[in-house]
Amino acid sequence: MGSLDIKQESSPLMTNPLDSEEFRRQGYMVIDFLAEYYKNIQKFPVRSQVEPGYLRKRLPESAPYEPESIETILKDVHDDIVPGLTHWQSPNYYAYFPSSGSTAGLLGETLAAGFNVVGFNWISSPASTELESIVMDWLAEMLNLPKSFTFSGDGGGVMMGTTCEAILTTITAARDRILDRIGREHINKLVVYGSDQTHCSFFKSAKIAGISPNNFRQVKTSRVNAFSMRPDALRAAIQADVDAGLVPFFLCTTVGTTSTAAVDPVALLCEVAKDYGMWVHIDAAYAGNACICPEFRHMINGVENADSFSFNAHKWFLTTLDCCCLWVKDPSSLVRCLSTNPEYLKNKATDTQQVVDYKDWQITLSRRFRSLKMWLVLRSYGVDYLRNFLRSHVDMAAYFEQLVRMDGRFEVVVPRSFALVCFRLSASAVIQRLYDSCHRHGHGQKFLEEETLNDVNAELLESVNSAGQIYMTHSLVDGVYMLRFAVGATLTQTHHVTYAWKQVQDHASAVLARRINSICNC
């Protein structure tokens, strides 16, 4: 074996990876890089245009043996990474649900990463735990949650990464609560309930918690009820399981479903669940953000009868990913289920039982200082600004909905909910026109047999997204393929919405023209 070739001179970074001056120099460069990115973000195709595997072709097969400069690395970020990004912060981004960023959120994240504390219990970093408890009570007050969900009452809140974590945590606590009563040997009798619009993370969480997939119930919704869960249908499903000797124990209601932002009737569903002694969780991942506005607060009426409530601040609250806020009425149910107390974590503060050890409120042990960025957001912008920020997106979505209704080729599939518009090229206005055009050439019947409205709308969406000027996604609900236009990017303004609609109209005209030509000329 040969000896290593040690250079006599080395940079401060090589001798000290946390050299303060080198951190300052490189930090300024990264901030400048991001500032230019945001300044020029509209120049990029919103949806990445690269092909699968593009990056492996550009990067070396092995990690570098010698250090590389930050200048070289940032150049590669610009040349190789940025082209592979879908630009969620673009003002022309309307896909999925938003992930709204802000200066305060980004800098709060930077502070948290800089401190790099691991706040699994109080003693490991008291400020991390205490700030989280305070901020969660602030947010509860903004949402007008019952005192029973706050630390000033008998409950409390915790920040997690995602809704999936929040639901898994609550299902696990609810599972243990019921099994402590009926015996753990009966776990295969436990049944969970959602609707056919409930987010997939619910059933994924139930599976991880050991609930048999055979015991997942998806209550059917319909367009008549705007795809919200019907209490009578829920009761019928629960009673059927009880009659079969099964044990209903968990209901997940949704305020703002992913597909259409449908709102389940929380109060009525809680009444049904109460009759069977079930744990009720309210998943308000998207729409819960808007419920700090008084005009939307009624959407979560009935929360006082639920056991837990969560929303994702990283979606629509100017707070960078990740930050899911979960409140529970009975924190002891989490602690009993998730507590760990090995010798190496024992300390006097925990022994006093006067502090919160958040490790016992979650699945993982390690945890990030998420409350710091939320604290910066709340202090930097204030409640009034945040409310108006949310309202501006709702207003822009209402404007887009109006534009859709003014074009006879399109229809709004379900009434706009919050800042999401679900629309499509309509059957009556489009298919009939195509049929009439082709019928004159003797091809009308062939069109009706071979082409579907869903195909036309899918082609429209792909045409729009491939152009790169705006980005939307779709949903398929009750057999209806629809385009989703979700307003929520921080930089979006009304003129961007107008531009987006013009893009949709132009691509619709092109798609319909191609359809007519391909059918009538065959």
Curated annotation (Swiss-Prot):
The catalysed reaction is: L-tyrosine + H(+) = tyramine + CO2; L-dopa + H(+) = dopamine + CO2
Q: Which domain of life is it from?
A: Eukaryota
Q: Which tissues is this protein detected in according to the database?
A: Strongly expressed in all tissues, particularly in thick roots.
* sequence repeats: from-to residues: 75-132, 135-186
Applications: An heterologous biosynthetic pathway of mescaline is reconstructed in Nicotiana benthamiana plants and yeast cells expressing Lophophora williamsii genes TyDC2, CYP76AD131, OMT1 and OMT11, thus providing a sustainable production of phenylethylamine-derivated natural products.
- Give GO MF terms, alphabetically: carboxy-lyase activity; pyridoxal phosphate binding
Top-rank EC class of the record's enzyme? lyase
Query: Which positions does the record annotate as the modified residue N6-(pyridoxal phosphate)lysine?
Result: K315
Q: Which range is the signal sequence, renumbered to this chain?
A: none
Q: In which pathway does it act?
A: Aromatic compound metabolism; Alkaloid biosynthesis
Pfam families xref list: Pyridoxal_deC
Binding residues annotated for pyridoxal 5'-phosphate, in chain numbering: T163, C164, T258, N312
Which keywords are on file for this protein? Alkaloid metabolism, Decarboxylase, Lyase, Pyridoxal phosphate, Repeat
What EC number is given for this enzyme?
Answer: 4.1.1.25, 4.1.1.28
What cofactor does this one take?
Answer: pyridoxal 5'-phosphate
According to its UniProt entry, one GO biological process term is: amino acid metabolic process
InterPro entries recorded for this chain? Answer: Aromatic_deC, PyrdxlP-dep_de-COase, PyrdxlP-dep_Trfase, PyrdxlP-dep_Trfase_major, PyrdxlP-dep_Trfase_small, Pyridoxal-P_BS
From the UniProt entry, list the residue stretches annotated as the region 2 X approximate tandem repeats.
75-186
GO cellular component assignments:
cytoplasm
Q: Which family does it belong to?
A: Belongs to the group II decarboxylase family.
Its function?
Aromatic amino acid decarboxylase participating in the biosynthesis of natural products derived from phenylethylamine, including mescaline, a natural hallucinogen potentially used in psychotherapeutic treatments. Catalyzes the decarboxylation of L-tyrosine and L-DOPA.
> Can you say what this protein is called?
L-tyrosine/L-DOPA decarboxylase 2
**Organism source for this protein?**
Lophophora williamsii (Peyote)
